């Protein structure tokens, strides 16, 4: 077991830049889509270039470490006034700022590595890592060949100290690892950092940067090993988890030492090349072309994998296995299932002609417009039937503020429909969102909607409300080893926390 764990040890060299985009995938996608690379998501009021950031990071780390060891550690208290390690007294807000500052320090090096890699590189769509905009190609192209899907909630560490252990093991500086442990043990809210909430995780509003970093690192550790084991799915017939790992190590030795040329091709026949993995908001989905028996083995394996390797207890009933041909898959607010569509193929042999009926699969991706209308009706954009209404609460706002709110609401919906070819639901939602703004502005100026549109200009209003989003694709460096390139196949990283959510999650 120890040798197998050593074999699965991840490459944590600073030269492998591909590790860091995986750790901060949520930040990177939000940065690319919502902010742009010229504006940092970590610093709202400041911009850091490559020349000054390194000096800033070194100063912050030196200052934090020096204060921690020079004045008998930081002192955090829940009362209003607490001893300040910088001298005098400080409020709880100052302590939170120090804690948040440490999270920023941890994030800066990863952000700089991404910028240094993107400089001078052509921005193309990556085939290893996919953004949220590729969810429809994933459903329409990849899941169409799948037969069964398993949906489960991603297991989180029971205590934040367990998540910090993985990050501390990968930290290069021992002082940084000691500072991470110190913050976890000294901060008063450490017992309520991550709280489960409807298959997602709500982080502390005061310190979400640092703990989101720990959570991402924990999930990345799990996914990195999972990608490797996914390629060994042919050995899932083993009953015991320990036996499963031992057989992986055994076959790897044979593949590398004895049958380096032939055994690999033999193993590939028994593997499932159509196993897809998707994670979003603390929930992940496994889609496979295999039978339900294979998915049951994956269910048994995942529970034991979390328990034995990560010391996390997961209940099997939280894993749901569905047949795509019989059940619909609810993911990202969409309903998708594979339906059998009969097709007629006419063939002719010599003089006799006959008909052959072949059953083909067709993936139907539907947007539940009913639930979206229900959410908009609760927000007073329309009634339960979808008829737009004016917003009296916006009457005191300026015209530009009203238009900006409508534009923001449209952008939330457009972000999730931007990659879909079936945009009928999107057009309906845009219609519902536009008219309340027009009605509110017309009522504010005491004129009709038609007169208001004529005064403003339909073209200007249409251009303002329907401005298309710019889809930005990132390209990430690949690993140097051929094996890791193989392990990254068909893994879709879609777990995004900072991009605006759909209206029903507000």
From Swiss-Prot:
Q: Which GO terms describe its molecular function?
A: RNA binding
Supply one GO CC term from the record. Answer: chloroplast
Which GO terms are recorded in the biological process aspect for this UniProt protein?
Answer: mRNA processing; RNA splicing; tRNA processing
Compartmental location: Plastid, Chloroplast
Mention any Pfam family matching this sequence.
Answer: Intron_maturas2
Query: What are the entry keywords?
Result: Chloroplast, mRNA processing, Plastid, RNA-binding, tRNA processing
**What is the role of this chain?**
Usually encoded in the trnK tRNA gene intron. Probably assists in splicing its own and other chloroplast group II introns.
Task: Give the family per the record.
Answer: Belongs to the intron maturase 2 family. MatK subfamily.
Q: What is this protein called?
A: Maturase K
Which species is this UniProt entry from? Andromeda polifolia
